[in-house]
């Protein structure tokens, strides 16, 4: 899971951020939060949540996310608007920021996702020169792809030495590590 992957990164002195949807997806992060807490490692858990008014209403994906990690996070913020001041982070313990969204934000997120996947990423991968100038410690997470996008992504992976996390929904099952 993304949570345990983040624990591994934290053990190697990275400061990972896990972003997840609402509901039981958040609950799946409890065990990684406990691991990071007892290992004195920082992980920032950013969780999307339904509006605060949905709590205790029985609405889908409206479990009580605020404080779900209990004492295993140094801080838990329940945010439904942009804070006016700085947020304190203890970089030796996990932290949870629960972001409560109203429905009008959905269309913006979908538009941004569509733009990022189709314009920025896919167009670069499909271009004639699929050799990209990659600098630094980058991780590419490849999730659900359209069938026509798979060949371009496979070509990119074959021609570039990058760290990749392939989700099952990506439809990519080849080994591009150069190892048998």
PLM regions: where:
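N-terminal alpha/beta PP-like core and its mobile active-site loop of ThDP/TPP-dependent enzymes
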Residues: 1-180
